[in-house]
């Protein structure tokens, strides 16, 4: 049986120094495993890494052809503890240069949500879900 867990997510970066700086501006600290060609950030339960997109394609043995401005059909989420945090986080994202795609609003399913894109158009949701359950480390364990 395959373990039911996601432990590491890698974003293929077009401009690693610029993207690294954006995530540092979020206040996220890099791990000791980061290098000039790789950035790793510990989050609550998942490691987020940044790796040059051409190198990522090479590592996966695929041909790199993606337009940097195209939608990548994947999104990441930052789940929060309170609905008001969605608004304050989006304001912080706006201040550091993130592109707000959807302003904070109440969701039809009872939560609060907003979307932004980082400098390379990776899609992020900032969300409060009233059903979310977090462990003592802040990792979401259920919703």
Predicted regions and their residues:
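Residues within well-ordered beta-strands of beta-sheet-rich folds
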Residues: 10-12
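Amphipathic alpha-helical segments
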Residues: 14-29
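Vicinal oxygen chelate
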Residues: 1-8, 28-83, 87-117, 130-143
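Conserved active-site tyrosine of GNAT-family acetyltransferases
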Residues: 19-23, 93, 121
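Short glycine-/small-residue motifs
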Residues: 123-126
């Amino acid at each position: 049986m395959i373990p039911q867990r996601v432990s590491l997510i890698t974003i293929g970066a077009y401009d690693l120094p610029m993207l690294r700086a954006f995530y540092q501006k979020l206040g996220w600290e890099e791990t000791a495993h980061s290098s000039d060609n790789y950035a790793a950030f510990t989050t609550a339960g998942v490691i987020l890494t940044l790796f040059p997109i051409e190198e990522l394609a090479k590592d996966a043995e695929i041909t790199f052809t993606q337009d940097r401005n195209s939608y990548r059909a994947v999104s990441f989420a930052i789940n929060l503890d309170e609905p008001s945090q969605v608004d304050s986080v989006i304001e912080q994202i706006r201040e550091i240069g993130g592109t707000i795609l959807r302003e904070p609003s109440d969701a039809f399913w009872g939560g609060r949500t907003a979307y932004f894109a980082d400098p390379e158009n990776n899609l992020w949701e900032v969300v409060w879900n009233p059903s979310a359950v977090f462990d003592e480390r802040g990792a979401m364990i259920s919703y």
